[in-house]
């Protein structure tokens, strides 16, 4: 995988994360919002670009026989709440699903300064709504 863009393309995709590996951005050095922490892959939560389902999730969900269901639920939720399919909105939806389905009442984040405030706001909104259901 080290240098193979074709192999890395089967992972999240360059619209989803920055990772500094073949086919992915390394981010902007010196900016905590756009630079991977300690070389670890980083979701591009600041991005307003509409994304598709990542290759890794497509493969996983198809193998499990639940691709259509997962995509339909995600798109339905985002659409009915007026959200675009962005990295932040997808990740926030998945985290809020844990709140809705399992009663999770908190998340730990060791690198909060690396996530933009709008993404924290969106996560808060979605999780607060999930608590009401």
Regions found by a protein language model. Name each.
Residues 1-97, 101-102, 122-133:
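Substrate-binding/active-site clefts of carbohydrate-active enzymes
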Residues 112-119:
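Acidic-and-aromatic substrate-binding clefts and catalytic sites of carbohydrate-active enzymes
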Residues 106-110:
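Structural recognition of the beta-strand scaffold that forms the well-ordered cores
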């Amino acid at each position: 995988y080290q240098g193979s863009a074709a192999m890395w393309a089967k992972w999240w995709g360059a619209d989803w994360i920055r990772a500094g590996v073949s086919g992915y951005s390394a981010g902007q050095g010196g900016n905590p919002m756009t630079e991977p922490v300690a070389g670890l892959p980083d979701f591009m939560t600041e991005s307003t670009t509409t994304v598709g389902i990542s290759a890794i999730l497509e493969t996983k969900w198809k193998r499990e026989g639940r691709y259509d269901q997962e995509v339909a639920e995600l798109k339905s939720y985002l659409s009915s709440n007026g959200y675009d399919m962005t990295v932040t909105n997808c990740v926030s939806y998945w985290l809020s699903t844990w709140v809705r389905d399992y009663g999770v009442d908190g998340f730990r984040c060791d690198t909060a300064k690396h996530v933009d405030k709008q993404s924290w706001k969106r996560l808060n909104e979605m999780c607060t709504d999930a608590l009401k259901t």
